[in-house]
Amino acid sequence: MGDLARLPLLEKAPTTHARLLAWVEEVAELTQPDRIHWVDGSEAENKKLTDELVEAGTLKRLNPETFPNSFAAFSDPADVARVEEQTFICSENERDAGFTNNWMAPAEMKQKLRGLFAGSMRGRTMYVIPFVMGHLDAEDPKFGVEITDSAYVVASMRIMARIGTDVLDRITQTDAFFVPALHSLGAPLEAGQADVAWPCNTDKWIVHFPEERSIWSFGSGYGGNALLGKKCYALRIASVMARDEGWLAEHMLILKLTSPEQKTYYISAAFPSACGKTNLALLDPTIKGWKVETLGDDITWMRFGKEGELRAVNPEAGLFGVAPGTGWGTNPNAMRAIAKGNSIFTNVALTDDGGVWWEGMTEETPAHLTDWRGESWTPDSDAPAAHPNSRFCTPIDQIDMLAEEYFSPEGVELSAILFGGRRKTTIPLVTEARNWSNGIFMGSTLSSETTAAAAGAVGVVRRDPMAMLPFIGYDAGDYLNHWVNLSAKANPERLPKIFLVNWFRRTAEGGFAWPGFGDNARVLKWAIERLEGKADAVETPIGFVPTGESIDLEGLDMTPAEVESAVRVDPAEWATELASIEEWFANFGESLPAALQSELDGLKTRLG
């Protein structure tokens, strides 16, 4: 075992899984950690790790009366978001990565990564985290093992995924396939060298090898770059698995809607980051008799059931939400879940009484805070107190409105799929697709103004197909074709209806054309009534939109004429939009599905 005599925990590994042991040994030899710890996921282990993180200054323990068993972390200012320019899909063939992904030949990338990872865990503990995405007792559980040198990652993964001994035992007993997910902060400690509160490296690489189903992440301790079960596995690698196995891994919420007649419907919805996905998943309806429960706020895996129905499951165990804008006024259900504790906050502000705060959390701004950079802050300060991409990480089972179906490995049958972006003009409040193919066209041309969740310019309109642009693990044209072709597996009577929504449309005066938040239930109600054949609509060149009277406005200070204005299809705006869509589709070249070209041609004809 070479130099591994100094790694005593390897001999006492709690598994006999040959591939796993060989991989752990290979990584230990490469990264040279001081010790190896197999994560069991227990309370005692979590307490020990969080105590150590508090002592190291990585975590700050919050006031136990207001935020029980909760902590705040503050990252290096250069490590605050996903790094899309350093995220790679290293497929064997460059064409399979497509134009939306960065690519490097796998052998060349592996050589580069081995150089970076060599000795990268020196002076640190190497944690081995067995995890499962979805349910352990699912028909086809999807396993992973993350190796990391960050205890913050262990504590966060414990919230976000099902981890620990039960998972490892199942991997061992069934000799299961697992996705190896390797993560290092890239901050080795030499003997006697003092650590910093947030170790990271200026050189960051987030790399996926789709054919071998593996992930290597170097240099970042932040969220999606480091919690590898999340975007890296559950979307980028899982989308490739889904392509090969005939299912879908999508950037979507799942909600359960119950009508006053006690009829239930399940809806999934795809929105780019910071477009209200968590708020919709945790919706408090403002219309009488309608009830919303949630099954998930970020990632949905969908498969066809035995009768050709499309079924959805949330593979995650926690919420990893953008904090700013989440407040008692806008999302009380999220706030109640957070108030139960057991949460980790990253890059929020601290109140003087040991609590946390961020923009939009309360109506009144505290008179004094410590901002996310550790500086004294008052409402007169120039910069926001919390980073725009600051996060809360909270167990999903703390949500009072969690639907019991969340715990079902079979998932739920979808009645509708929503696609939504953030556009000030052009896109109506809600549009019903003409059919499945037209709905995929809507999803493929989804667009939004960029947000703080990704590093780079803010406020530029970018196309974001199915809200998956940063997360498609293979060629984007092949991905859209996979969506188109899936309908062949479906029972056409049971295919979900597709709708395009835009909560962010502005009026001519510059205000929002729609109140949003809890009132979005009124749009969901219209969509459900369309499924049931009960609501009126107007046919437009882009699809069906509500009549002014068909949206329930009871109790809302809004007129049918204002609804008509919010769903108006403006020919001049759509002439510009058509040109923009043509430019977008040109990127796909040969891989653009013929069905989508024909949808575009049809739209052109209808717009005249």
Swiss-Prot record:
Cofactor: how and how many bound: Binds 1 Mn(2+) ion per subunit.
Residues reported to bind GTP: A274, C275, G276, K277, T278, N279, R391, R422, F517, G518, D519, N520
Cofactor(s), by name: Mn(2+)
Location in the cell: Cytoplasm
Keywords per UniProt: Cytoplasm, Decarboxylase, Gluconeogenesis, GTP-binding, Lyase, Manganese, Metal-binding, Nucleotide-binding
GO biological process terms, semicolon-separated: cellular response to glucose stimulus; gluconeogenesis; glycerol biosynthetic process from pyruvate; oxaloacetate metabolic process; propionate catabolic process; response to lipid; response to starvation
Top-level taxon: Bacteria
One GO cellular component term: cytosol
Gene3D superfamilies: 3.90.228.20, Phosphoenolpyruvate Carboxykinase, domain 1, Phosphoenolpyruvate Carboxykinase, domain 2
Binding-site residues for Mn(2+), renumbered to this chain: K231, H251, D298
Single GO MF annotation: phosphoenolpyruvate carboxykinase (GTP) activity
EC number(s) recorded for this UniProt protein: 4.1.1.32
Residue positions binding substrate: R82, Y222, G223, G224, S273, N389, S390, R391
Function statement: Catalyzes the conversion of oxaloacetate (OAA) to phosphoenolpyruvate (PEP), the rate-limiting step in the metabolic pathway that produces glucose from lactate and other precursors derived from the citric acid cycle.
Self-association and partners: Monomer.
Database matches in PANTHER family: PHOSPHOENOLPYRUVATE CARBOXYKINASE (PTHR11561), PHOSPHOENOLPYRUVATE CARBOXYKINASE [GTP]-RELATED (PTHR11561:SF0)
Name this polypeptide is given: Phosphoenolpyruvate carboxykinase [GTP]
Organism: Paenarthrobacter aurescens (strain TC1)
